[in-house]
Amino acid sequence: MFLKVSVVILCILLATLIGLNLCGFSYWQLATQTLRNRLQATHVAVQPQRVNFEELDGLPAPVQRYFRKSLQNGQPMVVSVKMRHRGTFNLSQTVEKWHPFTSEQRVVTQRPGFAWNADIRLLLGVPIMVHDAYIAGEGILHAALFGLFSLVNIRGTGKIAEGQLMRFLAESAWYPTALLPSQGIHWQAVSDRSAQGTMTDGTICLTMLFTFNDQDLIERVEVESRGRTVDGKIIPTPWYGYFWNYTERSGMQVPLNGEVAWLLPDGAKPYWRGRIIEIIYEFTP
């Protein structure tokens, strides 16, 4: 009798999990498509349409070397990007709770914006779905169990927007034409292996430190203060992104692996480690 009851309970739990997964997947996919439509609607024409190394004159030496290494003179400019990632995500800011994730990301370079859709798997395959986005000056962070039950839902034009624009700038190593001066990035020398990049979008102006490796490619991007979500509040915290495993994609040198971390008083706390498994570019005609 006990065995029969246990089997029935197990079947009910399984059916519930399957139902939540199916319902949540449908709901989340609709929300994801809405985000992507909003992102695409912000797109404006990229000018100029070709990379011209003449605009590198006067830039800090490591920045010039980076562009000459990662781009080709005369190549078209990146308009948009579709990419897929796979990796692990640490769901705790105090202990190590790494879980596997897969994600898809859309990027438009002008007006700068992105929409990241992630699926983080817990035990028994229970999903946490995440939207991380910057669209038309608005920052968005929404995480939901099964895609249905919100765990975090923050959006706005304040610190959350600034933090998401920082992500766009840091990840420009994946779409390097967006870092050119003609695309609105101002560069200032720091050392022979580093420089500050400043960008402005709407009312947001931010500066990040770029460090270049021995191959003249972006190795690390960091900032002294980026908004970290703690108990539903935004806390300014030092942050970095680290990139490696550069490979040629569509004529550009881009990193396939990355790690991002908060720099807490007791040391670095990585929370995202991933690899690009597919990247598709749309270029200017």
Question: Where on the chain are the PLM-derived regions?
Answer:
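Hydrophobic membrane-insertion alpha-helices, especially the h-region
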Residues: 6-23
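Aromatic-capped interface at the extracytoplasmic side
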Residues: 21-31
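N-terminal leader/targeting segments and the immediate start of mature chains
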Residues: 31-82
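N-terminal mature ectodomain segment of secretory-pathway/periplasmic proteins
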Residues: 64-150
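Buried hydrophobic residues that stabilize the cores of well-folded domains
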Residues: 67, 100-105, 133-137, 141-142, ...
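Short, hydrophobic/aromatic-rich segments at coil-to-beta transitions
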Residues: 78-84, 110-117, 140, 190-198, ...
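Flexible, processing/modification-adjacent segments and terminal tails
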Residues: 142-201, 234
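Gly/Pro-enriched, hydrophobic low-complexity segments
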Residues: 197-281
